[in-house]
Swiss-Prot record:
Residues 224-233 have a biased composition (Basic residues). HAMAP family: UPF0502. It comes from Burkholderia orbicola (strain AU 1054). Transmembrane segments: none annotated. Residues 196-239 are annotated as: Disordered. This is UPF0502 protein Bcen_5249. Belongs to the UPF0502 family.
Length: 239
């Protein structure tokens, strides 16, 4: 009887808080940059979260706040606490929980630590975690991450917009390798505005004098303008 090794199954995860995201980013970063001190103690982890370089935004959190966030991450199995030392030490479990390769983990880590960046910036900033051959390889892994995120997200109405549900089949890979999505820029992603190809027969909101439309149901703090281009595409801009 043939048996196959167990492979990690990606889990449905909730949206992380800024501190939880920062903790995961710090754990992965320090695993590669200072392996001698990894897994990290609570003190070292807090210092990494409050680090003033290679961080955006800069944080000033206490050990108590980090401990609370660690408890939540442990419930999600994203962080594990070691028991081989008298001082508690923590390590990440992202590769197994998310089921993505190390190259994607490297890009995701830099995004967690520094926020939205271009593909060129990601290639430069992730050099210590993984050496990407060129920008196109970075974009390929970003496309894979975006496709996974969209496929794992259940169909739901876009927050603040009275528009169509966001369905996994709406994310398609074209032959030229570019990812197209239907949905709002406020969704989880990499900080980039996705170009959208309007579906035939879909009802569009009326255009205003400026040539832009505003989503129905948006609040003052959550407004999205849809700028249409002559080519039939539109770019979603969060304002």
């Amino acid at each position: 009887m043939n048996t196959t090794p167990d492979t990690p199954t990606p889990r449905a995860l909730r949206e992380l808080t800024p501190l939880e995201a920062r903790i995961l980013g710090v754990l992965v970063e320090k695993q590669h940059t200072v392996p001698d001190t990894y897994p990290l103690s609570l003190n070292a982890l807090t210092a990494g979260c409050n680090q003033k370089t290679a961080r955006a935004p800069v944080m000033n959190v206490s050990e108590d706040e980090v401990t609370t966030a660690l408890d939540e991450l442990k419930r999600l199995s994203l962080v594990m606490e070691g028991s081989s030392s008298r001082v508690p030490r923590f390590e990440h479990n992202m590769n197994r929980v998310l089921g993505i390769p190390s190259q994607a983990i490297a890009l995701l880590t830099i995004l967690l630590l520094r926020g939205p960046q271009t593909a060129a910036e990601l290639r430069l900033n992730s050099a210590r975690l993984h050496g990407f051959a060129d920008i196109s390889s970075v974009e390929a892994f970003l496309d894979e991450l975006a496709a996974r995120a969209a496929a794992r997200r259940p169909a739901a109405a876009c927050a603040g917009c009275a528009r169509e549900p966001l369905d996994a089949p709406d994310v398609r890979r074209r032959e030229h390798g570019r990812l197209r999505e239907r949905g709002c820029r406020r969704r989880r992603g990499f900080g980039a505005a996705f170009r959208i190809r309007g579906a035939k027969g879909r009802t569009e909101a009326p255009r205003g004098r400026s040539g832009a439309t505003q989503c129905a149901g948006s609040t003052d703090g959550e407004r999205t303008r849809h700028r249409r281009r002559r080519t039939g595409r539109r770019v979603l801009i969060a304002s």
